[in-house]
């Protein structure tokens, strides 16, 4: 089945992204309201579909741990590998890392070598920063066990569209149809959800 690997309209500066997120570690939990909502909804969905304990989990783009903490509480993984492009994010997991419950791999998930044999690969609010999510989907398939799960959330084309229209800059967001086309090559799609979220708490 053919697939179109889409080229970014604008290059993504990973070094700039790393610097900006590194500076935001202390304020992230306060500012990332939408990301927190998304992580909690993802946790609820995973809790519905996945067996427990889940075995080996790889989380891409862990951030400060919105999803990580829920995974520990609900899926009880035997081994948890956390990844974020910012090394500074590891400071949010000193308890998990110190106890040996998790390991942390800092770096660009599109090129970083990850351990194979995962029962679940999960990512919340990170794939919009990738140069080629399609190639990453393919790669994740090689890291999963047979009958393993790949679950992710990303932002759609309505995200910050007003800002992009004014500034003329922004990320190239895949449509739901484009994502599904790329996923069907390697995965059986269990469920898809598209939700509008509030960016700020009131």
What are these regions (language model features)?
Residues 110-121:
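A short acidic, Gly/Pro-enriched loop at the edge of an enzyme's catalytic core
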Residues 120-132:
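A short SAM/SAH-binding and catalytic strip from SAM-dependent methyltransferases
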Residues 58-112:
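Class I SAM-dependent methyltransferase SAM/SAH-binding core
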């Amino acid at each position: 089945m053919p697939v179109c690997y889409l080229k970014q309209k604008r290059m993504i500066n990973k070094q700039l992204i790393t610097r900006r997120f590194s500076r935001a570690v202390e304020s992230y939990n306060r500012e990332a309201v939408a990301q927190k909502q998304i992580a909690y909804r993802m946790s609820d969905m995973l809790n519905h579909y996945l067996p427990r304990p889940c075995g080996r989990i790889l989380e891409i783009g862990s951030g400060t741990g919105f999803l990580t903490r829920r995974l520990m509480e609900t899926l009880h993984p035997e081994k948890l590998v956390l990844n974020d492009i910012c090394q500074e994010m590891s400071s949010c997991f000193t308890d998990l890392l110190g106890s040996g419950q998790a390991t942390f791999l800092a770096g660009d998930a599109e090129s970083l070598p990850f351990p194979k044999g995962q029962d679940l690969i999960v990512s919340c609010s990170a794939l919009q920063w990738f140069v080629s999510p399609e190639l990453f989907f393919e790669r994740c398939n090689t890291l999963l066990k047979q009958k393993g799960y790949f679950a992710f959330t990303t932002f759609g084309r309505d995200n910050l569209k007003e800002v992009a229209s004014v500034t003329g800059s922004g990320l190239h967001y895949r449509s739901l149809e484009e994502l599904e086309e790329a996923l069907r090559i390697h995965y059986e799609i269990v469920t898809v959800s598209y939700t509008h979220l509030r960016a700020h708490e009131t």
